[in-house]
Amino acid sequence: GLELSTPLRVGLGYDSHRFESDRPLILGGITIPDHPGLAGHSDGDAITHALIDAILGAASLGNVGTHFPPTEEKWKDADSTELLSNSVAVIDREGWMVVNVDVTVICESPQISLFAEEMKERLSGVLQVPVERISIKGKTNEGLGWIGESKGLAVHAVALLESR
């Protein structure tokens, strides 16, 4: 069986935000044109927020709120890819590296498949992993609930870390 000192860890992240018409939509570090943005203290990038939680969680090092509290003014309108980069540095200092990530965005619009490759390219450098180790896909909520009513979106992310 696996020993407690196994060099692999898995983390699960989640984030959701409501749409807000007076902001740009930023997902996966890119701006999605012609779509309402996401409410949030930082830039509202739910993909990067879910990835931060997955990565920090896998290393047992907290979450987006403990490292970048919404009560602190310095994180207001922050670029979430910078927060993700900071989180990768945190796990690196503790001897961990990202092996791969898998992201599912749940929304009626935008159509995630149209932007997934650009998101993967953007996040590859931030996560310090090859593009082929990043999966980003979209699912609808089939018109059900607040997501189905296009009031916002939700993101699930899984990260695999390896001890260096």
Question: Language-model segments: what does each one mean?
Answer:
Residues 1-2, 157:
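Generic detector of short, aliphatic-rich beta-strand segments that form the cores of beta-sheets
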Residues 2-117, 126-127:
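RNase III-family endoribonuclease catalytic core
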Residues 111-113, 120-121, 126-148, 152-164:
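C-terminal binding/interaction regions
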